[in-house]
Amino acid sequence: MKSYKDLDVYNTAFNLAIKVHKMSLELPKYELYEQGSQIRRSSKSIKDNIVEGYGRRKYKADFIKFLVYAHASLLECLSQLQMIDELYEIKEVKLLI
């Protein structure tokens, strides 16, 4: 592997972050800086932690630690998506959870 971009998990996380970002822009205006900001940050954190872990892959414990962080960010993102799904009628949310 030459780059983190060769990792399937990174590409999946990157695509999720893009979809979540676009979906978040459909939230009511008053939520763009609250719920919208939080879900954008948590979705981007997934891919960022994968990249940081890849950068430390020489140290197995560090690599694993950042993958655990990525998983935790994924769970946070899913929780945010479930909340948005309950509160608002945005059809793209159902496709993400």
Region annotations inferred by a language model:
Residues 1-97:
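Amphipathic alpha-helical assembly/interaction segments
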